[in-house]
């Protein structure tokens, strides 16, 4: 079956009819763009297609500007709208990982509802991905490599060229007289993928002609085995995970280590996080799940933090330490730090009404300076028939997790705490 006919059949089964093509300007994505342009013209068996393309300008090569221009010229030729997005690459975890993260986050910004991202990954890419997973010591999920349709970073992705080799794409490009750019970094064998592509895999393909197809079969077996595990554990998983970012630990400690790690991986996958290593999972189980009951353990996973409270795990973003932050309330609206939103105040004849998120509190007017602070460790009186008590006890009774307590705006009149907005008011001691 040729490329065009195969993709046409794939699109007949696809739920989306709007597609955003990831266009680098290289051979693979140029072929992909050409095929979709032809389908737009052909379409006897397809409903009308909405096609756009996006080029990510990483700024890592001196040729990056000329690549962007090439992509624009190509899209003008095919009459396909193009988005060119410049990104800053965070190299903390390596250029490859940083570029990939920046690329997908930029694409996510432009992907519309009901639109599907289309990438030009092919059979050779699949083999490379499998070997990279093997090098990392990945389990079934990692060795399952790429699927023709999947979800990544919360985006639906279609990879229609996954069943074709690079040689087949080259033959198509030459037949159609297509022009494409070549990224000079593809020859740099310091990068693992390039080392595999340029040094290792050619030797294997020379010895075994159908090596890529064999790898694809193995990857598919791994994917199916992982799906089977997920199916068998789905009922138990639902008992532990009824809220997406929360994982209940009831009965969890009684399971085998294999069952524990499988359920945790399902939870992390549900939240679209990259899979941790076996060492990291073991550390999470030992240092967080099996930590002492009174502890407030946490575990950092790239840009997320796993925390434990009242026998549940919670997934949050990393939070800034706001305990030394004091903000003077001098206007009706105050912008709070660390993405906490705005605190606003309205007044009537006798009172001030403070609003934050979905909460509000009404306090008497004052001539004292008003400030907003975060975190307090003293004693307060909240309940009329009880004496002053440690604020920690009040937070515990209200069921507020420790990491949230220092993120709730505290209203001070002078140096006197008056209220934790939305949670409690401080009463005068009798």
Curated annotation (Swiss-Prot):
It catalyses: cytidine(34) in tRNA(Ile2) + L-lysine + ATP = lysidine(34) in tRNA(Ile2) + AMP + diphosphate + H(+). Keywords: ATP-binding, Cytoplasm, Ligase, Nucleotide-binding, tRNA processing. Its main location: cytoplasm. One of its GO terms (cellular component) is cytoplasm. ATP binds at residues 24-29. It is an enzyme of class 6 (ligase). This is tRNA(Ile)-lysidine synthase. It comes from Haemophilus influenzae (strain ATCC 51907 / DSM 11121 / KW20 / Rd).
């Amino acid at each position: 079956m040729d490329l065009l006919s195969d993709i046409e059949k794939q699109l007949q089964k696809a739920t989306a009819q709007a597609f955003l093509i990831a266009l680098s300007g290289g051979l693979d994505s140029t072929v992909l763009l050409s095929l979709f342009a032809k389908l737009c013209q052909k379409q006897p068996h397809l409903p009308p297609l909405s096609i756009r393309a996006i080029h990510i300008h990483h700024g890592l090569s001196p040729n990056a500007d000329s690549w962007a221009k090439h992509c624009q010229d190509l899209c003008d030729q095919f009459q396909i709208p193009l988005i060119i997005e410049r990104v800053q690459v965070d190299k903390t975890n390596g250029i490859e990982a940083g570029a990939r993260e920046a690329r997908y986050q930029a694409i996510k910004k432009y992907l519309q509802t009901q639109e599907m991202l289309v990438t030009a990954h092919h059979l050779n890419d699949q083999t490379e991905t499998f070997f990279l997973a093997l090098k990392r010591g990945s389990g079934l999920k990692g060795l399952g490599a790429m699927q023709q349709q999947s979800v990544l970073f919360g985006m639906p992705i279609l990879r229609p060229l996954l069943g074709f080799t690079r040689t087949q794409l080259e033959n198509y490009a030459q037949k159609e007289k297509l022009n494409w750019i070549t990224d000079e970094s593809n020859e740099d064998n310091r990068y693992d993928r390039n080392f595999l592509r340029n040094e290792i895999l050619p030797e294997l393909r020379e010895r075994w002609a159908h090596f890529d197809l064999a790898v694809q079969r193995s990857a598919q077996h791994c994917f199916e085995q992982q799906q089977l595990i997920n199916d068998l554990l789905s009922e138990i998983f639902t008992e532990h995970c009824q809220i997406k970012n929360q994982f209940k630990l009831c009965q969890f400690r009684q399971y085998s280590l294999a069952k524990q790690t499988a359920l945790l991986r399902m939870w992390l996958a549900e939240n679209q996080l990259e899979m941790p290593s076996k060492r990291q999972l073991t550390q999470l189980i030992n240092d967080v799940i099996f930590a002492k009951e009174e502890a407030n353990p946490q575990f950092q996973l790239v840009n997320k933090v796993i925390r434990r409270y009242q026998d549940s795990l919670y997934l949050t973003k990393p939070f800034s330490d706001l305990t030394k932050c004091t903000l003077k309330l001098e206007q009706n609206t105050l912008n709070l730090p660390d993405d906490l939103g705005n605190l606003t105040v309205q007044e009537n004849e006798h009172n001030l009404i403070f609003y934050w998120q979905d909460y509000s509190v009404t306090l008497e007017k004052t001539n004292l300076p008003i400030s907003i602070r975060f975190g307090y460790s003293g004693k307060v009186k909240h309940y009329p028939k009880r004496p002053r008590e440690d604020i920690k006890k009040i937070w515990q009774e209200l069921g507020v997790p420790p990491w949230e307590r220092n993120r709730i705006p505290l209203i001070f009149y002078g140096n006197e705490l008056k209220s934790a907005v939305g949670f409690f008011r401080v009463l005068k001691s009798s």
